[in-house]
């Protein structure tokens, strides 16, 4: 039994030592956490900064909620350009309007002029070894492109206001585009015969 008693004594000694070590470790961990929280409070509030009482209320609500508490400065509305939607107008009403009103309505930020006057290209080098058939085909192609450009240039200036108002109505715009394509195809067909 003496061997058995020594075995019990050594087991109890090991268990007591482990319990004491766990207790001391727990005390050190609690002490360390308390010290860490105290250091964080000292770092957030330095000696020069003392928060006001009304700041605590503002910090609890989000930034958009804080806007209500700020006194608004009077704003001069005249310094901003007013953005307004264009009123819906029919094309017939604009055609009846006098020309002075049309020029006031037309505010252009970019030129929509598609004339070939400003566009100068370098002339292509002519190949001298072209056959008569190739020359005839090229002349026919030049005639077709010339007829297309004369159609574009043949619009009278009065139709520009009407044409700009067509862009307000997409259905009319696509109808006009389709009609122009069909007339160009029929013109090309007539020239080919």
Swiss-Prot record:
PANTHER family: T-CELL RECEPTOR-ASSOCIATED TRANSMEMBRANE ADAPTER 1 (PTHR15951:SF2). This is T-cell receptor-associated transmembrane adapter 1. The modification Phosphoserine is found at residue 46. Homodimer; disulfide-linked. Interacts with CD3Z. When phosphorylated, interacts with PIK3R1. Keywords: Adaptive immunity, Cell membrane, Disulfide bond, Immunity, Membrane, Phosphoprotein, Signal-anchor, Transmembrane, Transmembrane helix. GO terms for biological process: adaptive immune response; negative regulation of receptor recycling; positive regulation of T cell receptor signaling pathway. One of its GO terms (cellular component) is T cell receptor complex. Coiled coil: none annotated. Phosphorylated on tyrosines upon TCR activation. It holds the Pfam family SIT. Residues 32-193 are cytoplasmic. Residues 129-145 have a biased composition (Basic and acidic residues). The lineage of its organism: Eukaryota, Metazoa, Chordata, Craniata, Vertebrata. Residues 119-128 have a biased composition (Basic residues). It comes from Bos taurus (Bovine). Residues 1-10 are extracellular. The keyword Membrane applies.
